[in-house]
Amino acid sequence: MNIPRFMPGHVLHTSEDIPQSESPLAGRRTRPVSEAFSSSYRHSDLGGYPPYGLGGSATAGLGSLSAGMGNLNLGGTTPGLQHLGGGLANTATMDSEKWLQDLELYNAILEEMATVSLDKDFKDELSSIEQWFGVLSDGERTAALYALLQQTNPVQIRFFITVLQKFGNMDFDGSPIGNSFENGAPQQQQQTSAQPSPMGQGAMGQAMTGGLGGLGGLHPHQTTHSNLNPNAHNPIYAPVGTFPSTPSHKHTSSLSTEPIGSRRSMIATPEHDLNAQIANTTAMKLAALSTVSNRASLDDRSKRSSFHQHTNSQESTPTKPGTPGGSPAPGAHSLATPMKGHHQTSSSSSITQLSGASSASPATDIKLLRDVSAWLRALRLHKYTECFKDMEWQDIVQLDDAQLEEKGVNALGARRKMLKVFEQVRDAQKDGTLGGV
């Protein structure tokens, strides 16, 4: 049996001969022989194996490297991205809370408006204000509106700004200027503008239609970062009139023409769009509810206008010579037939005499004249009943402008209306055509 010979100066070591070191492997009781031979072979050209383990320190270095590699998570995100994601989550949470608070406030206001719009006393007062406003000059109207705007809150300011912006995009005939309503509904705009109404109700309908149509089409900067807002196409964020979320719409909204270097921030854009959408939605709802309170007075004025047109057509129609009593021609009778049953409270004499008056029946009805309170209520002037509580109607109709102001009728529009009615009553009294006599 041949015993292997080793070079002079080399000693075969076992794991038990190697002293304990600070190596991470020192905790083991034995070491494999392969480690000893590997260490001896690596350092054989140095003239001998180092007595206190270079192999131990090398193993420690490899252990530290292994530990460092273990701490490296190639599948995770960098700390900067984690911080950015947390900031986006916090911003989205704050925006959601603010949106819910604003939504509760808007819903409360809308419910209150709906309740008030059904109040009969409120509608009577509002009708009186409209009639008073209708007789004011341009300067008086501007001064009155400016005084009322001083009492508005932020929600009402948003509403008025939206409505006035829509008014600014319209011509005098109610048609939109340029292509400002390209994203709207042209057919609905034509229908709303064709309905005449006092106090600019037709223009308000145009503003409502244009606003709802504008919310339906998203602008490029609104669709650029739509992936940051998962509820961008949720129905709760979309007002009435916006188109539903379809695959084609989502595909179209994902495209953007906005440059990368835009001054709009990736984080600030969803919040700005959300607040603007909430403001526009609330403004449109307020505009829709604002027409409810005027519906009764609008219907009344429409009926009154139709009645005056009917009576004027009766007066202007020529009569046949052979007809007894000067009855109107068959054509005029056919025009008067649809109007039967609508206004039968006034006598034929008062209709003929006061057909051009703005409020013929209440102004010259003797039954109402005998009750001053009921007469003023029929004229929408019941708020001034206390000014004439000790007077008879014969004395009231003789008052002039200065005397009315002394009585407490400080509003110029109300005094003008009273003077017109007083003149009608005096003329009917002279001619003996007071209704109910």
UniProtKB/Swiss-Prot annotation:
One of its GO terms (molecular function) is mRNA binding. The keyword Cytoplasm applies. Residues 1-40, 175-262, 295-362 are annotated as: Disordered. InterPro entries: SAM (IPR001660), SAM/pointed_sf (IPR013761), SMAUG/VTS1_RNA-bind (IPR050897), VTS1_SAM (IPR037635). Signal peptide: none annotated. It is found in: Cytoplasm, Cytosol; Cytoplasm, P-body. One of its GO terms (cellular component) is P-body. Residues 367-428 form the SAM domain. Residues 243-259 have a biased composition (Polar residues). Residues 208-217 have a biased composition (Gly residues). Residues 185-207, 344-361 have a biased composition (Low complexity). One of its GO terms (biological process) is protein transport. Its main location: cytoplasm. Pfam families: SAM_2 (PF07647), Vts1 (PF25479). Belongs to the VTS1 family. RNA-binding protein involved in post-transcriptional regulation through transcript degradation. Monomer. Binds to RNA. This is RNA-binding protein VTS1. It comes from Yarrowia lipolytica (strain CLIB 122 / E 150).
